[in-house]
Regions:
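General small-molecule cofactor/ligand-binding pocket signal
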Residues: 34-36, 64-68, 119
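Hydrophobic alpha-helical membrane-association signature
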Residues: 18, 45-48, 106, 147
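Residues at secondary-structure transition points
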Residues: 13, 67-74, 101, 105, ...
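Acidic, proline/glycine-rich short linear motifs
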Residues: 20-59
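Gly/Ser-rich helix-loop-strand patches that form or flank binding pockets
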Residues: 76-127
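Short acidic/Ser/Thr-enriched loop-to-helix initiation segments
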Residues: 1-34, 125-151
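Structural beta-alpha unit
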Residues: 41, 54-88, 96-97
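Flexible loop residues that form catalytic
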Residues: 10, 38-41, 93, 139
Length: 151
């Protein structure tokens, strides 16, 4: 199923909820997590990522941390291809400004071109999550069939 799961790590108030989802899936599927932060590397940032992983009881052998400095959509797409990820988890703000609507958001750009399955979660400040509604698009490929069977 999803053996290699990527997560777009941000240090926003919403980042914890994405980590909780990733930790849940990692444990349920015995997957390897690939944690990607867009920005310059620093030990302080790496320690923050490790602290989040530890908070959700993710074993150090179950994840790999990457830092990339590039436009977020491009960096994440390259990351997906380089690591051959089966799933990428990222957050999305529910409300966008008009400017962002026309220029495009990271989530929107990846929905159009990501070479893998995406799990896009609305931003929530609390770490609790529950899936009430799922929206699934398909191109009727074997990859899509695998994702739908997972549900």
């Amino acid at each position: 199923m999803f053996k290699k799961i990527g997560i777009a790590v941000s240090f926003s108030p919403y980042g914890k909820s994405l980590f909780k989802i990733a930790a849940f899936l990692q444990k349920e599927l015995s997957s390897q997590l690939y944690l990607m932060h867009i920005g310059n590397f620093s030990e302080e940032k790496e320690n923050r990522v490790k602290a989040l992983a530890q908070e959700f009881n993710i074993d150090e052998s179950a994840y790999k941390i990457e830092f990339k400095k590039d436009e977020p959509s491009k960096a994440l797409a390259k990351f997906v291809e380089t690591e051959n990820l089966d799933l990428l988890i990222l957050g999305a703000l529910e409300k966008e400004t008009t400017l962002k609507y026309y220029i495009g958001s990271v989530a929107r750009n990846l929905m159009r071109s990501a070479p893998t399955n995406l799990l896009i979660c609305p931003a929530k400040k609390e770490a609790d999550f529950e899936f009430n509604n799922l929206f699934i698009t398909t191109d009727y490929s074997s990859r899509s069939e695998t994702a739908i069977k997972f549900l």
